[in-house]
């Protein structure tokens, strides 16, 4: 399946919540869902039919996929991996998604959105333990140090971001704003993931 390249604000309206896909714009009055808090399309404002159990499960899966920018095949791969791990499957799934390099870059404040973080990673602006990594899906481990590549610190976009770096990252990572690095000090716990996600619905969908 090809990556969605249309208006991302439609995705937020489809899911009925802010997915924070456009960075700073999402925090302003220009956000589309603040102005049109209904689904896109001709019948977006109509009530429609009551969603089925399967429909609710599908929407939850689509919402999480869109938050993290993961395609269906890869998302299923994450689920299968989570299912093989010890512990609660849904929490395992979210933990894998949180460990993606593009998400870590976003959480550290080196990008204003996950899509921007994904693009910056692909362009080779980040290192892990001093080595350049340009794979957004790379899974970080405890002890990894994620940093902005030295040569990239002078690029206009990253220079702008680093000059106003004020994000407080989750407790499973430490940020050194002066060095433009972040250290993974633990794996994320469920309470660290402050997103309105009902992961049990995703597990139920794939268990059908």
Swiss-Prot record:
One of its GO terms (molecular function) is rRNA binding. It comes from the Bacteria. Keywords: Ribonucleoprotein, Ribosomal protein, RNA-binding, rRNA-binding. PROSITE patterns: S4. One of the primary rRNA binding proteins, it binds directly to 16S rRNA where it nucleates assembly of the body of the 30S subunit. With S5 and S12 plays an important role in translational accuracy. Part of the 30S ribosomal subunit. Contacts protein S5. The interaction surface between S4 and S5 is involved in control of translational fidelity. Belongs to the universal ribosomal protein uS4 family. This is Small ribosomal subunit protein uS4. It comes from Desulfitobacterium hafniense (strain Y51).
